[in-house]
Amino acid sequence: MHPPHTHNINSKKGMRTYLRTHGTIAEIIMWRLLKSRQIHGVKFRRQFSIDNYILDFYCPELRLCIELDGAPHFTEMGRLQDKCRTKDLLAIHNIQTLRFENDMVLKYTEWVRSKVLEAVSLCKLDGSIEDLVINPYILD
C-alpha cells in the first residue's frame, strides 16, 4: 500500500495556477533569481503544494522552502500561522523554510540572492540552514 499523495494534489491546482499568474513583484523578482537552476544548479519549483500548504518556492532536492511575506504575515494571526506552517513542514516533511519580507526582495535583491546561495550551500553541505542568520537591519 502506498502512502497518501501529499504533493501538488489536484484540489490545489487552481489555486497554484492563480498564485503563479497573480504573483507579487517580489515573487516575480525572486523567481528570476531561482529559475533555470541559477542557484548552485538546483531546481526550484514555484507555488508547489504540500498537504494544505502552497509553498512560494520549493527545492525538492534539498527540501528547502522559500517564503516571501507581505502585509498579511505581519499581523499576530499571520505570524502564528507562519510559525505553525514552518513547524509542520519541518516536523512532518523535513522541509526547512527560509523567509524574506517582500520589501527585502525589492530593496536588497542581491543581498537576498546571497542568502539564498548561502542556504543552498548549507543544505548541500550538512542539510541544515539552522545557523543561517537573516538580519535585514544590518542593511540600513
Per-region residue spans from a language model:
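Solvent-exposed, charged helical/coil patches
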Residues: M1-G41, K124-D140
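Basic, amphipathic alpha-helical patches used to engage nucleic acids or provide basic targeting signals
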Residues: L19, I28-I29, R46-L122
